[in-house]
Amino acid sequence: KGLGKVGAKKRHRRVIRENNQGITKPAIRRLARRGGVKRTLSGLVYDETRNVLKVFLESVVRDAVTYTEHAKRETVTALDVVYALKRQG
């Protein structure tokens, strides 16, 4: 009687196939320009950048979801993402 939400729900996580090719070559070039790269990039850089970006974003999303679950919410807020990014450094 009146126990409310006792624990975080075990959620089914969807398995996502390898689709990081969605990060296009021009998008990586724009990120590099914003980061201060002036010259053109080597062909090998793009796959490595996709892999690094994937690992970084997975970590940020994992932290943001952890903040959301700790607050016993089901919606990830912008602040959850901000705190997750701050935690990354």
Curated annotation (Swiss-Prot):
GO terms for cellular component: nucleosome; nucleus. It comes from the Eukaryota. CDD domains: HFD_H4 (cd22912). Signal peptide: none annotated. It is found in: Nucleus; Chromosome. One of its GO terms (molecular function) is DNA binding. InterPro entries: CENP-T/H4_C, Histone-fold, Histone_H4. Disulfide bonds: none annotated. Keywords: Chromosome, DNA-binding, Nucleosome core, Nucleus. Belongs to the histone H4 family. Core component of nucleosome. Nucleosomes wrap and compact DNA into chromatin, limiting DNA accessibility to the cellular machineries which require DNA as a template. Histones thereby play a central role in transcription regulation, DNA repair, DNA replication and chromosomal stability. DNA accessibility is regulated via a complex set of post-translational modifications of histones, also called histone code, and nucleosome remodeling. The nucleosome is a histone octamer containing two molecules each of H2A, H2B, H3 and H4 assembled in one H3-H4 heterotetramer and two H2A-H2B heterodimers. The octamer wraps approximately 147 bp of DNA. This is Histone H4.
